[in-house]
From Swiss-Prot:
Keyword Manganese annotated: no
UniProt xrefs under InterPro entries: Ribosomal_Su5_D2-typ_SF, UDP-acyl_GlcNac_deAcase, UDP-acyl_GlcNac_deAcase_C, UDP-acyl_N-AcGlcN_deAcase_N
Protein name from the UniProt record: UDP-3-O-acyl-N-acetylglucosamine deacetylase
GO terms for cellular component: membrane
UniProt function note: Catalyzes the hydrolysis of UDP-3-O-myristoyl-N-acetylglucosamine to form UDP-3-O-myristoylglucosamine and acetate, the committed step in lipid A biosynthesis.
Family: Belongs to the LpxC family.
UniProt xrefs under Pfam families: LpxC (PF03331)
GO biological process: lipid A biosynthetic process
Gene Ontology molecular function terms on file: metal ion binding; UDP-3-O-acyl-N-acetylglucosamine deacetylase activity
Amino acid sequence: MQQHTLAAEITQVGVGLHSGVNTQVRILPDETGSGRYFVRVDLPDLPIIPAQVAAVSHTVLSTQLGKGEVYVRTVEHLLAALSGMGVDNARIEIDGSEVPLLDGSASVWVANIAQVGLVSQPVNNQVPLTVTEPIWVYQGDAFVCALPAPETRFSYGIEFDLPAIGNQWYSWSLTTELEKASASFAAEIAPARTFGLLHQIEHLQKTGLIKGGSLDNALVCGPEGWLNPPLRFANEPVRHKILDLVGDLSLLGAFPRAHFLAYKASHNLHIQLAQKILDFGFDFAQSNDFRF
């Protein structure tokens, strides 16, 4: 079995969705078993925040990781890109409190990763997790679950009153072959951009959120349709929800072999499921055909 890290460092600068502040991110290769973690290089002592479920401190409209009073928010797109492209170990240096939104998708991160390439890292005694019984979390009619399955698959459904979105479903599988999985993620999931509803934007801005949001980095939908077409996919919104789910579940460290099924879910429910998977323990089932 193998892990992977970057063959060279990556640097990106951009504005945060909620803070509206420009930050710089440097992603550096790291040793086998180090995992993915953030370093706040703008603060004394360079505090480290691991990209783990236990570090989640906030889940309203994005996923935030924290350690004490130090935090990094809106981590999900970057973490989805790293995990979807097979980067297990990475030091993510950031000079502010929010990861740049870039174009609202994970495409820029994915292109950067593909450009520098990966380095294989042999691993001994790594035992992956297989889900052997259904694990559910729900709130009202929204839910997310992990079901026993022969492969790692993500399926998502959304439903909005706006005709341009309506009811959408999409399903995507993560093959055990790294090259095929990365290509599939880059083509089918990474390009899907974050989206918002026109009638909610003013309220969110009044509450101090989406200060960095614009028609250049987020799709906006109103009663008459999309304000900034064209879409990259007819079902781009639900594909973006899979992107968010991949990013949130990457906090497990590696994806269990399971079918992750979600409907009208949220970052909060995603993280609740991840925690529940951890609560089951990593010894209730084993598998030997996991790609990480």
